[in-house]
Amino acid sequence: MMTTILTIHVPSTPGRAWNMLVALQAGNIVARYAKLHLYDAFAIQESRRVDAGNEIAPLLEVEGMKVGLMTCYDLRFPELALAQALQGAEILVLPAAWVRGPLKEHHWSTLLAARALDTTCYMVAAGECGNKNIGQSRIIDPFGVTIAAASEMPALIMAEVTPERVRQVRAQLPVLNNRRFAPPQLL
């Protein structure tokens, strides 16, 4: 069964919206996620017109693997990725309109690899292309290795992702089991 994940702006209150990630399976909405971390950085203030969400999306089941949802600026906050990994996520999906700017491409690639390593999850990141955004969609394996990538132009990228690879990496690099403490809300 095909799973489609997309982002839209959904009205919240008059003149405002949620930056919403929606997951569809067989034409039905199976998950909604209102972006937690609004992009109020690099001279942009998303919070002027967008309301922050307040819940982590439930994990999805896709082809026998558990998938966590994040979007864009959420990438800079490792707690969200970690919380989903601790719930059992094996893949983290992140659509993003990553705005161009000094060192932004470096931030994108570094943070994607870091989140894969922090969580020992695959990262599937769809980067919006265009004049303002960097594109650079990527699939990164749980060891932080890019296994598929696109440039700044629209492209279809594919890679094999398997639960066996997640188990193999987690056996070699058991960071989720080796954690000694965390704030209570992340347990």
Swiss-Prot record:
Record domain CN hydrolase: where:
1-163
Pfam families this protein is in?
CN_hydrolase
InterPro entries given in the database record: C-N_Hydrolase (IPR003010), C-N_Hydrolase_sf (IPR036526), UPF0012_CS (IPR001110)
Function description: Pseudogene resulting from a nucleotide deletion that introduces a premature stop codon at position 66. This is the C-terminal fragment. The intact protein (AC A0A140NCB4) hydrolyzes deaminated glutathione (dGSH, 2-oxoglutaramate) to alpha-ketoglutarate (alpha-KG) and cysteinylglycine, has less activity against alpha-ketoglutaramate (a-KGM) and no activity on glutathione or L-glutamine. May function as a metabolite repair enzyme.
Q: Which family does it belong to?
A: Belongs to the carbon-nitrogen hydrolase superfamily. NIT1/NIT2 family.
Name the record gives this protein: Putative protein YbeM
